[in-house]
Amino acid sequence: MSVDQAVLNRIWSETILTELNRFGVNHVCIAPGSRSTPLTVEAADNPNFTIHTHFDERGLGFMALGLAKASKEPVALIVTSGTAVANLLPAIAEAKLTGEKLVVLTADRPVELVGCGANQAINQLGIFAEHVSDSLNLPSPTLSTPLNWLLTSVDEVMFTQRLRGSAVHINCAFPEPLYSNTDKSTYQGYLDTVAGWRDSKVTYCQRFNPKTSSAIPSCGDNKGLVVIGSLPLIQAQAARTFAEQMGWPVLADPQSGVSSDWAHFDLWLQNPRMASQLDDCDLIVQFGSRIISKRFNHWLEKHVSRNQQGGDTQYWFVSPRLDRDNQSHLPQWHWAEQPSAWVERTSGFSSEHAGWADKLAADIKQVTQHAKGLFISDPKSELSEIALAIDVAERAQGVDLFVGNSLFVRLIDMFGKLDNTEVFTNRGASGIDGLFATASGVQRARNNPMLMFIGDTSALYGLNSLALFTHSELPSVLVIANNDGGAIFDLLPVPQEHRESFYQMPHGYEFEHAAKQFGLQYRKPSSLAEYQSLVSEHFASGQGALVVEVQTPSNQAVEHLKSFDKNLHALF
């Protein structure tokens, strides 16, 4: 009996995708390719899926990352065989470190065509190595392989992802032919072997993990410090509520979307007199991870290390992820639960040392006022990246905020003060690639206006993903801070003789024609007032994407930082 392989390929694809949908996959991202036809056609025919496409697999991976980041759901990707698969690695590596759930469906040649010189065939087994939580290498579809085996195999991978997060990889070896008009009912008997599952709405297998919640020790006699890292806004707000309840100072990373009276800590922690006001802290409670400030991480290591030398400072960490997040290898108590759930269990807590760091908060107000006086007091003055960082809270009101990597995210960490803003970043591997694509994915999932900040080198790296904004009707402002290369290296002790040629790599490019190529609006303001006006006006009455290029001298931000540091030491 001859087998219609194309139909069998589609039956397996339909089975996999239906089960993924029951695991919560609603968005599917597809790149063009022939070998992936069975998956592509079945995804397109499934009314439960929202389909997203991109011609570049690297950008596709980051778009899926943004969708998963914003929706808090697993997102599937479908790509063809060969280097298309390899191009997904950067996004998968980021997801490994930040926990977004990607389900990577890669089409492959059958085993007999791998390693023998066949076209577009590479070894895809284990290609993502330790960057995925689990992987499944499927054989070529045959009638002798039961569909219930296929389902339990997919379920096992998805159960692992449910527990550990990050990406999982399902490699699908499809033999030719790949195209057929024959109906799948030709193999109705094969389909009926899982008829009960097909008629239901639940996953083939189900697994229930017991939840354990360790008691939270009383901390009312501690002088505590609350640190809020990268978290969804609702979780960050819960963490700040705990700090307010205890009367303790709060150091909020800009990725949290909240702030406090102890803002700008990456600036004032370098001032010995100000930093010393935290010396009495004997308990640090950190919610969420990925703190941007290197100065805070150094302070944390130094302060908590006293515990190993006869001191008594404790370090608590609250994050639902099971992975180790302890770069200084400190003695740490980790509650693997959502901050909101942890805070709810402390509703009766109070502290006898409430307000112990209020004097420091009063000093920090002077830092805020001084920064505003230096950099944004005259809206008609020349634009600077620090001015943009100070102004970000005003421009981001009522919209989502996506912040790229390198210099600008650090300036927001130093000078920004966000007020209940939903913030998105790629601060796992902290690469400069895929940022436009990730931002597009976030906006597609949330359907909100978006303000994005990205550096010029990052923009060049992901330029073709501007195509993802071409047909968007939602207003978005893509601010490109163009300092002509990697100005961040001015902050690092790189060899002076090689600084420009091998680190900064100035390019001399502007972005007006790039915006036009992808049908996007473009403006290049010359003053802070003009910048503020055009951003606010676009969110008020515009639609689609507006590229705003802010051009500054390459050494401006670093010179401003050096000057401000001197002023800070003079103030205190």
Swiss-Prot record:
Its EC number is 2.2.1.9. GO terms for molecular function: 2-succinyl-5-enolpyruvyl-6-hydroxy-3-cyclohexene-1-carboxylic-acid synthase activity; magnesium ion binding; manganese ion binding; thiamine pyrophosphate binding. Pathway: Quinol/quinone metabolism; 1,4-dihydroxy-2-naphthoate biosynthesis; 1,4-dihydroxy-2-naphthoate from chorismate: step 2/7; Quinol/quinone metabolism; menaquinone biosynthesis. GO terms for biological process: menaquinone biosynthetic process. It catalyses: isochorismate + 2-oxoglutarate + H(+) = 5-enolpyruvoyl-6-hydroxy-2-succinyl-cyclohex-3-ene-1-carboxylate + CO2. Binds 1 thiamine pyrophosphate per subunit. Keywords: Magnesium, Manganese, Menaquinone biosynthesis, Metal-binding, Thiamine pyrophosphate, Transferase. Pfam families: TPP_enzyme_C (PF02775), TPP_enzyme_M_2 (PF16582), TPP_enzyme_N (PF02776). Its cofactor is Mg(2+); Mn(2+); thiamine diphosphate. The keyword Magnesium applies. Homodimer. Catalyzes the thiamine diphosphate-dependent decarboxylation of 2-oxoglutarate and the subsequent addition of the resulting succinic semialdehyde-thiamine pyrophosphate anion to isochorismate to yield 2-succinyl-5-enolpyruvyl-6-hydroxy-3-cyclohexene-1-carboxylate (SEPHCHC). HAMAP family: MenD. Belongs to the TPP enzyme family. MenD subfamily. This is 2-succinyl-5-enolpyruvyl-6-hydroxy-3-cyclohexene-1-carboxylate synthase. It comes from Vibrio campbellii (strain ATCC BAA-1116).
